């Protein structure tokens, strides 16, 4: 009989119960007992949902108070030694110190989980780290599920992936050298799970989809031989997010009882495993765990029916990956219309899709006729819908020419035209875009959205805020101003609500990290701009000052990356449609007299594919759609972009090919070390390295910012340097913002005084230098 299961389930709750319980506990408004009660209730509800849908196991081990990688580290005793915590006695409060930091300890580093929008806490490996024993939370949850009558399958992050995701610290030369010490801790966990009556452990090794160095792939055989000898439950090796076919021979050889493959992202990979090993279960990931569209059940059944005939009971069906990455339950959704809702499936609905496939496989198509027909009708409705397909948008995208993705002149020519228009001083000062959003601003936006505030009153309040922001910037002495973005709740949602082809849920929340949840927009159809989105705000702001005002837009790749994207056309095509909508906005801003336009791309690097062989294609189209959005303007209109990453080296050629006149980047926390890559690459255009960290309420001393600017001037010619904070200032308070910016302007004045003979890029004295630099 075919088995159905899920690799994981969202932990936050359909109404974000975990988020609110965590934040209440952190504020001291509730007790640890209250928090634990919420966790217990959520686990019970989620296990019951799996049972009620007909899954053969409930998955235990996917719940975490903050992050599953942190919880794995705690289980294995692999906590950073700098905290001095005893893993076996770890309290919830201590676990939150690891995750969030406190006055005595910086938090653990956090980074993206593969190519998703979830963030995990990075384990720290030091020479003095000793593994196991750790917390007993996992075993408590196993007993909790068993006591409720559930058949348990445990999900556990595998040892090689755990080490691969970690960072070496404290002089540790080789993370992999710790594997022999780590394996006994895993073996002990597996033995204890067997003693608790657990039959199967899903051991996640998503690192197997990556291009691993030989030493890392070679580590799998001995590691799993050790685990197989531990006398634990049967192991289901889980891979996801990409094909593992390049490691097919290795995976076939491992002493595990089953393997999970992502057949949504990489359906073709099954061929590399043919014939399927006779000693292994195949867990076929045929329901998309990362997107919200209904599964084409007819198509999925056509894929799994032959597998069922060949494998019989050795065929399991599952989502492609954990359902952590999709909202909990479509039944809780109130904002979407019935047609659009009918095209979607959240986590709870995806469990039902698995049950339909199981019924059709075991009892035949007729037994699942109604559900299959409903799926087919939804797929057909979406394919034929006029709200999805817009011929004029498709024709415009198809007509894009190479010259539409190129500025009219090279950077040195543009720099001269822009400087003639803008007359900027050496080391121009600016900010990244947003300014503090007070409770009054947020309240006005919310009242306007609910219809409680008339349009004219709302306009007056926003204009008053813009006028205040402009006046404050002028008083501080900034050189290029922004309007402050008071009208925007979110840099993607604001634009999505003004574009056709986008929809927004009321309750489509997913976990980003800890208690932070995001509600990604839904791109369901061809994207176009019915009318200008930002022009009137920027035009009004520019009317208040003689200084140049930057228009502020979110770039096409970021609009794509931070959304649930339609799956019926290539992502590149959707990105191009967004770029064309932004191109129209850019041209309208220019026509309104806006001389500088910033197109933010904080998610440009996040879109990188997991496999090295796919990276060049992505970078080519990602840079091209940016240029499409930016290239319809005159030479004297200055295009800015902003990015914030911890690593630039591998994408610098692509960033250069975006051909923005000015790029601002986040560098203060790295003490300007990130800027070194731009210097070594000889980045040809202008750069604004962030001189202070906006994520901290601390106001840096003038001397600190001056020292950072000095370091920057040693890497990038001072004529091409801008001065700015790391990121937008939306989440900060006005007193700290004004103090920090005042210090930033003073640090800039001091540096200008030491470079009195220099002038900003594009002025006649420096044109030759820039032409030479651009050709270097």
From Swiss-Prot:
The active site is at 695 (proton donor). L-homocysteine binds at residues 432-434, 485, 600. Residues 767-776 have a biased composition (Basic and acidic residues). Zn(2+) binds at residues 642, 644, 666, 727. 5-methyltetrahydropteroyltri-L-glutamate binds at residues 16-19, 112, 516-517, 562, 606. CDD domains: CIMS_C_terminal_like, CIMS_N_terminal_like. Its cofactor is Zn(2+). Keywords: Amino-acid biosynthesis, Metal-binding, Methionine biosynthesis, Methyltransferase, Plasmid, Repeat, Transferase, Zinc. Binds 1 zinc ion per subunit. Its EC number is 2.1.1.14. InterPro entries: Cbl-indep_Met_Synth_N, Cobalamin-indep_Met_synthase, Met_Synth_C/arc, UROD/MetE-like_sf. Residues 755-776 are annotated as: Disordered. Pathway: Amino-acid biosynthesis; L-methionine biosynthesis via de novo pathway; L-methionine from L-homocysteine (MetE route): step 1/1. L-methionine binds at residues 432-434, 485, 600. Pfam families: Meth_synt_1, Meth_synt_2. GO terms for molecular function: 5-methyltetrahydropteroyltriglutamate-homocysteine S-methyltransferase activity; zinc ion binding. Gene3D superfamilies: 3.20.20.210. GO terms for biological process: methionine biosynthetic process; methylation. The keyword Methyltransferase applies. It catalyses: 5-methyltetrahydropteroyltri-L-glutamate + L-homocysteine = tetrahydropteroyltri-L-glutamate + L-methionine. The keyword Metal-binding applies. Belongs to the vitamin-B12 independent methionine synthase family. Catalyzes the transfer of a methyl group from 5-methyltetrahydrofolate to homocysteine resulting in methionine formation. HAMAP family: Meth_synth. This is 5-methyltetrahydropteroyltriglutamate--homocysteine methyltransferase.
């Amino acid at each position: 009989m075919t088995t159905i299961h899920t690799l994981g389930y969202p932990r936050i709750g359909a109404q974000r119960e975990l988020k609110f319980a965590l934040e209440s506990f952190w504020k001291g408004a509730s007790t640890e007992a209250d928090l634990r009660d919420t966790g217990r209730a959520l686990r019970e509800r989620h296990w019951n949902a799996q049972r009620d849908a007909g899954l053969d196991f409930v998955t235990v081990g996917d719940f975490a108070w903050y992050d599953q990688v942190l919880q794995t580290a705690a289980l294995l005793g692999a906590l950073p030694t700098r905290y001095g915590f005893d893993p076996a006695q770890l309290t919830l409060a201590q676990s939150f110190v690891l995750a969030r930091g406190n006055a005595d300890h910086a938090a653990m580093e956090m980074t993206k989980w593969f190519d998703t929008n979830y963030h995990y806490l990075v384990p720290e490996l030091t020479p003095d780290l000793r593994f196991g024993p750790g917390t007993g939370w996992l075993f408590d949850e196993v007993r909790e599920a068993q006591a409720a009558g559930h058949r348990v399958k445990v999900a556990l992050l595998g040892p090689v992936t755990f080490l691969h995701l970690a960072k070496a610290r404290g002089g540790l030369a080789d993370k992999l050298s710790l594997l022999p010490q780590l394996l006994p801790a895993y073996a002990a966990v597996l033995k204890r799970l067997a003693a608790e009556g657990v039959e199967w452990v899903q051991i996640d090794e998503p690192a197997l989809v990556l291009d691993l160095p030989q030493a890392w792939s070679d580590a799998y055989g001995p590691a799993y031989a050790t685990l197989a000898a531990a006398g634990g439950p049967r192991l289901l090796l889980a891979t996801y997010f990409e094909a593992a076919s390049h490691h097919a021979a290795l995976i076939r050889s491992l002493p595990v009882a089953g393997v999970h493959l992502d057949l949504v992202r990489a359906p073709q990979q099954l061929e590399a495993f043919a014939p399927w090993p006779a000693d292994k279960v195949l867990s076929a990931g045929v329901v998309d765990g990362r997107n919200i569209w209904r599964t084409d059940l007819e198509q999925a059944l056509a894929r799994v029916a032959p597998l069922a005939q060949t494998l019989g009971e050795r065929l399991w069906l599952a989502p492609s990956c954990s359902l952590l990455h999709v909202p909990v339950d479509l039944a809780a959704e109130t904002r979407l219309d019935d047609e659009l809702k009918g095209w979607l499936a959240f986590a709870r609905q995806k469990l039902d899709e698995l049950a339909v496939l199981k019924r059709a496989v075991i009892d035949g198509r007729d037994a699942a006729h109604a559900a299959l027909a409903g799926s087919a009708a939804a797929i057909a409705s979406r394919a034929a819908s006029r709200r999805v397909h817009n011929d004029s948008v498709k024709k415009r995208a198809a007509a894009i020419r190479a010259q539409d993705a190129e500025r009219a002149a090279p950077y040195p020519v543009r720099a001269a035209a822009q400087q003639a228009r803008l007359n900027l001083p050496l080391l121009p000062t600016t900010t990244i875009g947003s300014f503090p959003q007070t409770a009054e601003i947020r309240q006005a936006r919310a009242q306007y959205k609910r219809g409680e505030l008339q349009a004219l009153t709302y306009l007056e309040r926003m204009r008053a805020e813009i006028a205040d922001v402009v006046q404050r910037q002028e008083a501080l002495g900034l050189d290029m101003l922004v309007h402050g973005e008071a009208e925007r709740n979110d840099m993607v949602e604001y634009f999505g609500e003004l574009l056709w082809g986008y929809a927004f849920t009321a309750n489509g929340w997913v976990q980003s990290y800890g208690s932070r949840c995001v509600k990604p927009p839904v791109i369901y159809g061809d994207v176009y701009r019915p009318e200008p989105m930002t022009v009137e705000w920027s035009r009004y702001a520019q009317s208040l000052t003689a200084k140049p005002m930057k228009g502020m837009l979110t770039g096409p790749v970021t609009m794509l990356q931070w959304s649930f994207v339609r799956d019926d056309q290539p992502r590149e095509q959707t990105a191009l449609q967004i770029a064309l909508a932004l191109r129209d906005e850019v041209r309208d801003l220019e026509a309104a007299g806006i001389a500088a336009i910033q197109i933010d791309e904080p998610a440009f690097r996040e879109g990188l594919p997991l496999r090295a062989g796919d990276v060049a294609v992505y970078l080519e189209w990602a840079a091209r759609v940016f240029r499409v959005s930016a290239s319809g303007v005159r030479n004297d209109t200055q295009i800015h972009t902003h990015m914030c990453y911890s690593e630039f080296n591998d994408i610098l050629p692509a960033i250069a090919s975006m051909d923005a006149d000015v790029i601002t980047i986040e560098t203060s926390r790295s003490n300007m070390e990130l800027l070194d890559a731009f210097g070594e690459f000889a980045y040809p255009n202008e750069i604004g390295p962030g001189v202070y960290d906006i994520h901290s309420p601390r106001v840096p001393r003038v001397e600190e910012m001056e020292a950072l600017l000095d370091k920057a001037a040693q890497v990038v010619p001072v004529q091409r340097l801008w001065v700015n904070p790391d990121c937008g200032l939306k989440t900060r308070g006005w007193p700290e913002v004004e103090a920090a910016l005042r210090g930033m302007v003073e640090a800039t004045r001091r540096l200008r005084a030491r470079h009195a003979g220099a002038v900003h890029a594009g002025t006649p004295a420096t044109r030759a230098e820039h032409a030479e630099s651009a050709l270097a």
